[in-house]
Amino acid sequence: MFGQKRLSREGGVEIVVKELCIRMVKQGNNVTCFNRSGHHVSGNEFDAHNEYDGIVQKSVLTIDKKGLAAVSSSFFAGLKSAFGNYDVVHIHAEGPAFFSWLPKFFGKKVIVTIHGLDWQREKWKSGFGSKFIHQGEKNAVKYADEIIVLSKGVQDYFKNEYNRDTHFIPNGVNKPEVVEAQQIKKWGLEKDNYILYLGRIVPEKGEHYLIKAFKQIQTNKKLVIAGGVSDTAEYGNKLKELAAGDDRIVFTGFVQGRLLDELYSNAYIYCLPSDLEGMPLSLLEAMSYGNCCLVSDIPECAEVVEDKAIIFKKSNVEDLKDKLQDACEHSETVHELKIQASDFICAKYNWDDIVNKTMKLYGRN
């Protein structure tokens, strides 16, 4: 597999690749992941790993400059997978799919997972990056034996735009252990005394809407913005400027392990105010911990939560503010959604089922 940065929690693609690979290895398959070289936000201890739960990890040459890291690592991963002794090459995301022709030319079966229409993302809306990702999408259509999509909306897009049939196989989620607040107390956080956003710090996730809305509501609860900044430091600084003057707002930086478990386990509400999603893994995770979720009305979120969450109008700070205030004032509504969330989402999105569906595509002639 390639397209991920590393087997880490840096983003949704990375989590998906790790969950798929772990289960494929347990089924007796030999799995290799071609990862970017260099350091990442998960910590120094992850940089030297050559194997993870039986998954072979190989680093490929990566030009560590904005706009070039993904292109260079995907090219060399495509090259190594083309010449390697592999039956199937599974590529993740539209940009890396640009190089789907490489393993295909050398007789490999090629599977591409479209994690979202990446050319719609703020940082790829123009210039070389936009053209490269658009061509990656076209190359996936042309060279991939099978294409996996994570939402019905993207499935419709490929059918309407290219008359290409795809396979709808969404992401999955594990049933977690809910834990007590301990380490998060260093930020003044306790059970149900904060609203949580946890995910990448990028404009399309809409954290700026959340901060603007939160600053207008009357509550003693805190707002926690948890997530790492990779190549979006400018946006991260903008969020901190927006939050200035409101000491209820807490920025934790990148979190994982016990800290992540505690944040999900003890939140009053989890909020995902995205303008754009492929399939929001953080939303699945939040619901799996039994959270009441407040999400934008984009199809990728609405399809996931159905009637088991609170929904506001995308990009609408006023509506988000009203929904936040109402939730803070009506704990009974929040509690009712909490008790439904975990069983609902874990039954709907099961990783073992998803891996089995993916393996069936690997075996199709």
Language-model region placement:
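Nucleotide-activated donor-binding/catalytic signature segment of Leloir-type glycosyltransferases, i.e.
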Residues: 236-258
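Short hydrophobic beta-strand element within catalytic cores of glycosyltransferases
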Residues: 292-295
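Conserved acidic donor-binding segment of nucleotide-sugar-dependent glycosyltransferases
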Residues: 310-318, 326-332
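A conserved mid-protein helix/loop that constitutes part of the nucleotide-sugar donor-binding site
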Residues: 15, 193, 197, 202-216
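Short alpha-helical donor nucleotide-sugar binding micro-motif in glycosyltransferases
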Residues: 254-255, 262-267
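Membrane-proximal helix-turn-helix segments that form the acceptor-binding/catalytic region
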Residues: 79-82, 105, 129-147
